[in-house]
Swiss-Prot record:
SUBUNIT field: Homodimer. Heterotetramer of two MnmE and two MnmG subunits.
Species, as recorded: Polynucleobacter necessarius subsp. necessarius (strain STIR1)
Keyword Ligase: no
Gene from which this protein is expressed: mnmG
Localization in the cell: Cytoplasm
Cofactor: FAD
GO MF term (any one): flavin adenine dinucleotide binding
Chain residues that bind FAD: 13-18
Keywords: Cytoplasm, FAD, Flavoprotein, NAD, tRNA processing
GO cellular component, one term: cytosol
Name of the protein in its database record: tRNA uridine 5-carboxymethylaminomethyl modification enzyme MnmG
Function comment: NAD-binding protein involved in the addition of a carboxymethylaminomethyl (cmnm) group at the wobble position (U34) of certain tRNAs, forming tRNA-cmnm(5)s(2)U34.
Binding site for NAD(+): 274-288
Amino acid sequence: MRYSKNFDVIVVGGGHAGTEAALASARMGCDTLLITHSIENLGAMSCNPSIGGIGKGHLVKEIDAMGGAMAAATDEAGIQFRILNSSKGPAVRATRAQGDRVLYKAAIRRRLENQPNLSLFQAAVDDLPVKGDEVQGVVTQMGLEFMAKKVVLTAGTFLDGKIHVGLNNYAGGRAGDPAAVSLSARLKELKLPQGRLKTGTPPRIDGLTIDFSVMLEQPGDLDPVPVFSYLGRPEQHPKQVPCWISHTNEKTHDIIRGGLDRSPMYTGVIKGVGPRYCPSIEDKIHRFASRNSHQIFLEPEGLTTNEFYPNGISTSLPFDVQWDLVRSIRGMESAVIVRPGYAIEYDFFDPRQLRHSLETKVIGGLYFAGQINGTTGYEEAAAQGMLAGINAGLAAKGKEPWLPKRSESYIGVLVDDLIARGVQEPYRMFTSRAEYRLSLREDNADMRLTAIGRDLGLVDDYRWGVFCRKQEAVSRETSRLQNIWVGPKSEAAPFVSQLLDQDLSHESSLAELLRRPGVTYESIIALGDGMWAPETLDEDLGLAAQISDQVEISVKYQGYIERQATEIARQEHNETLLLPESLDYSQVIGLSKEVQQKLNLHKPETLGQAGRISGVTPAALSLLLVHLKKDLGHTQEAHE
């Protein structure tokens, strides 16, 4: 049976990638359908009840800058907020929030149900009908056909998912949910290159059985209280609660070692590779054998539950070993497990077979986003989902895709890393992955992306108005600081000397003073009882804080940022030089067989992408550039 209505875009999966994809497509005016096996689990935080962190928080800010839901939902559901790396430079400062699972799901579902142009349908998808090389829609488990111009697949860990607890295993997408076995088989029929990855989760603990009095309390930040969304306010936050810190010990490690003979990871039952930066406790004990202790964060799952998430002891050991290892930890001697930890193996598809739009090269109109592409983490999934939803929507309208650059966003870094390099293990974002991270900060994601989002139809009038007000205020205040001068003999000189802890030797603008070590924007405007304070930055105190932060960072780091902008411009030429899809690299004289094979395998779209493939040297790029100019006369056409 065929459904009575056709859609512009169908999104399969209601996790973090799927919800952002569906919302983005619908905001752009596309008639969008989100199909999920469980409407109750839309936006569920399947593992750690937190959003953000180093690199990840940057992605959330970028999603928010373009009108996405994750940051705003976190402001409504976050029960603890912290700024990580607050004492370090602005490039690596990152927001992290502990979330209430129930409140977060409710916030996401409310946005989905109230989004114009978006329909929801509960069903499992088993098939993707393809005509020629173009996807036509989806077919559900009960045989119902939904037709669409474009399809976004965000299947998470559900594709042929297998859950492991000790040597016992069973099919599942996550605890309590079925695996997508038929859909996985269908994708393999389409000859898409596939592999297996693994992730895991710790046992959940009844908080009433934990002795917090012997643990270290970890409160959130209070002055100021962070927010995630550029439109967020601390007043939106629910009740704030602490996390708690404990540690494993030698007894814990002995218990784990004693159970390794029944570990699916260490007996060869699990074949998939797990995330390097979120290892299981078994891996930690094995890889860091000399350490006698590992930190554990006891994180509350929400305000209406007693469950705690012991971050740091993800495990797939048998339940009896989990029970003993938990009870060996200080403060958890009487702890009761309410949900066992487990590992899950699942199919992923090589992201090198994707275009930068996240459309598959093999099947036109089919887009992949999230863990299906080999990533790990809610934030990485949400960023891909938004991008896939945007590009599916643009394609449905007959428009060119939006391809974010590495130099303009962490989303661009993420996608380029996946497509140029592929994955050998679950990929997670770090600030260290971005070569232009001083320009890609949390505080300026809106300055980088909101105008783009507006042009794409993603940003509503209210967000646009607030952004324009902020942008104008930052420009006005920066100019004011550049045009107020103070000399050694001026009335203000004593105040400046006191601030600098030395005499002012020459005339300086306030902007120049702000660039000095230890000088802040707040200290400048407080001089002489506020003689240089602006009349007002904005009536909205939250926006005023954003403005002052933006002014201080842009002024203080102006020289570094300008040098980075020059470097970006220099790289742009080769970065955007298009490579013909039909180019046979074995015909490029001078390239080694290895490089020829890698280029023919990956089929990079631009010279910049080619340069990020492992083993492709600058010398190889020079030979390729000569070939393009000499044999193809391609240089001019590449930029048209």
